[in-house]
Amino acid sequence: SYGTRVAQQYAMRHPQATHSIVLDSVVPNAQGLGNIFARNLDDALALQFGVCSKDPACKGKLGDPRAELDRLLATLRSTPPTVHYRDATSGEWKQGVLRADTVAGLVRMYAYMPLASGLLPKLIQEANGGHYAGLMALAQMMSGEMQDAMAMGMQLSVVCSEDARSMVAREEDAGTVLGNLMPKGMAAMCAV
């Protein structure tokens, strides 16, 4: 994370004031973060979804979660459905279009919450059966929470100054859940 980078820089510049630091998700300072999201997410999903795939009861009920996700994303890319869903925050009925990018973003954020990510295989299976309301409600709820929780201006100030040049579309990311969504989106924001 960029917070980790700040901690590393502080420790490097002020060793006399740093007794110890605890870092989570350490990435070398020289590595651009813009192009590691897609591969890292797919690696995390392989571990998370692998738990279900190795459990006969889970696999029997939900199939192969990664294959189910890939099937859902393909469907949403070709024909994104209009979904009637109940807003998880207000309880109001709403309508919206469920897009592959929305689901990819949802899956990305849930990779940070392993306990909550246990919901995804079931919701993905339901969506593949044409029942999109649960997934749409969760995606909209997550989107609203993230707008309040993430300081995009702060993140972009660091991303754009440190990693903008490294954010390029890469062929090897095309088959991942995120594809080139993150580097393209961040590069566009940094260009403004």
Predicted regions and their residues:
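Glycine-rich nucleophile elbow surrounding the catalytic serine of serine-hydrolase chemistry
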Residues: S1-A11
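Short, flexible loop/turn elements at secondary-structure junctions
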Residues: Y2, S25-V27, A164
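A catalytic-pocket lid/entrance helix-loop region that shapes and gates access to the active site
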Residues: Q9-L72, Y112, K122-A133, A137-M146
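Alpha/beta-hydrolase fold active-site neighborhood
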Residues: R71-V192
